[in-house]
C-alpha cells in the first residue's frame, strides 16, 4: 500500500508541474502597455498636483481622484480616508506657511538694493570732504609755548581759502600755475613774531641757568 501511495503522490506532483508549465507557456505575452501599467496603483496627474498644495481646488475633487486609484474594499477604503486627511492637513499647512510671507508691495526695494556706503568711499583720489566737522576734540595735547598776544594772518591761508571755495566736481582737473602770482619773488615770513622770539630766548636762558646751578653746587661741595 505504501508503495502504491507513493506512486500516486509522484504522479500527482508530475501532473501539477505539467499543468503549471502549460499555463505558463500558453499565457499571452505581456508587454509594457496600458494593461501592464494598470496593474500598479499609482497617483494620477491631478492627484499629484493636489498633493503639492495647489490652492483654489475643491477638496471633493481630491477625494474623487484618490478614490479612482484605490480598490473598492474595506482595507483600501481605510487607506483612502487616511489619504484624504493627509491631503487636507498638508494643504492647510502650506496655506499657513504662505500667509507668513510678506508682500512685495510692503517692502521698500530701494532701501535693500542700494548698498549702505559711507561718504568717504564716494570721494575721488585727491578730493576733500566739503562738510568740515567743527567739533572740538575731546583731548587737546599740551605744548609748552610762550604766551602770544597777536597772530599775523598769512597770505598762504588766504590762498587755501580760495581753493576750498571752489566747487569740486566729478571730473579731475589738470594742475595749472596761477599766472597772477609771482613765484620768483616770494616774501618769506617768520613763523614767530619778534616778541615771541624774545620770549623764547628768555625761556632758553632760564632753562640753561637751572641746568647749570646744580653743577655749580656740586663743584662747591
Swiss-Prot record:
Listed GO biological process terms: acrosome reaction; spermatogenesis
PTM-bearing positions, type Phosphoserine: 59
Keyword flag Cell division: no
InterPro entries per the UniProt record, alphabetical: IFTAP
GO cellular component, one term: 9+0 non-motile cilium
First and last residue of the signal peptide: none
Keywords in alphabetical order: Phosphoprotein
Gene Ontology molecular function: intraciliary transport particle A binding
Short name of any one Pfam family annotated for the protein: IFTAP
Entry annotated with the keyword Phosphoprotein: yes
Function comment: Seems to play a role in ciliary BBSome localization, maybe through interaction with IFT-A complex.
Subunit structure: Interacts with IFT122; the interaction associates IFTAP with IFT-A complex.
Name of the protein this chain belongs to: Intraflagellar transport-associated protein
